[in-house]
Amino acid sequence: MGISDNDVQKQLRHMMAFIEQEANEKAEEIDAKAEEEFNIEKGKLVQLQRQKIMEYYEKKEKQVELQRKIQRSNMQNQSRLKCLKARDDHLKNVLEEARANLSKISADRERYPAILKGLLLQGLFQLLESKVVLRCRKKDEEMVARILPECLEEVQRTWGNRSEVKIDNEHFLSPESAGGVELLAKDGKIRVSSTLEARLDLIADKITPQVRTALFGPNQNRRFFD
């Protein structure tokens, strides 16, 4: 018995429905997989962008904190420098006051000859040259001439050699000088300043740390002390 046209049409419709269902299921499967992959990639992209944003703000936060530290350090340094300058200015004022009082020493005609002798001896012993040119204030010239022989004898007794000292009566120390002498040897190549100002500067270099401590207290940053 042959298959009727109706049966053939029915089988064809059944086959087409099956194929269509398979195609729809496959399309849905492909869509689902594509959506899953899209969501995964989208998640990765979102996470990557979130990480970049976090890194950006972390970097900015570190930069801001660094700037704060730099500003704080600069302010501390400026404050420290101002404090140090104020201290140095005060110390300079103390030394300037001492320097201004030097003239009172040479004005004391009872004490000054002994002080002048000490300055002259210090200069001669520091120099220890056989030929020396001596410069002093013009108003001290007579006093220097009086005490010089005694100083030369003392140098000779100690050194064993005699110094020939010529008082320079053409070139004098400045009238503004507080007093003392200046000694030259080897045609001026060697020069020793034994003036009151020079001695004050020498003493100031040695005692400045002690003066700072007396005025401002010990330095908290200093680990070792003399």
UniProtKB/Swiss-Prot annotation:
Matching InterPro entries: ATPase_E_C, ATPase_V1_Esu
Keywords: Hydrogen ion transport, Ion transport, Transport
GO cellular component terms attached to this protein's record: proton-transporting two-sector ATPase complex, catalytic domain
One Pfam family of this chain: vATP-synt_E
Oligomeric and partner information: V-ATPase is a heteromultimeric enzyme made up of two complexes: the ATP-hydrolytic V1 complex and the proton translocation V0 complex. The V1 complex consists of three catalytic AB heterodimers that form a heterohexamer, three peripheral stalks each consisting of EG heterodimers, one central rotor including subunits D and F, and the regulatory subunits C and H. The proton translocation complex V0 consists of the proton transport subunit a, a ring of proteolipid subunits c9c'', rotary subunit d, subunits e and f, and the accessory subunits vah-19/Ac45 and vah-20/PRR.
Function: Subunit of the V1 complex of vacuolar(H+)-ATPase (V-ATPase), a multisubunit enzyme composed of a peripheral complex (V1) that hydrolyzes ATP and a membrane integral complex (V0) that translocates protons. V-ATPase is responsible for acidifying and maintaining the pH of intracellular compartments and in some cell types, is targeted to the plasma membrane, where it is responsible for acidifying the extracellular environment.
Family in the record: Belongs to the V-ATPase E subunit family.
Name assigned to this protein: V-type proton ATPase subunit E
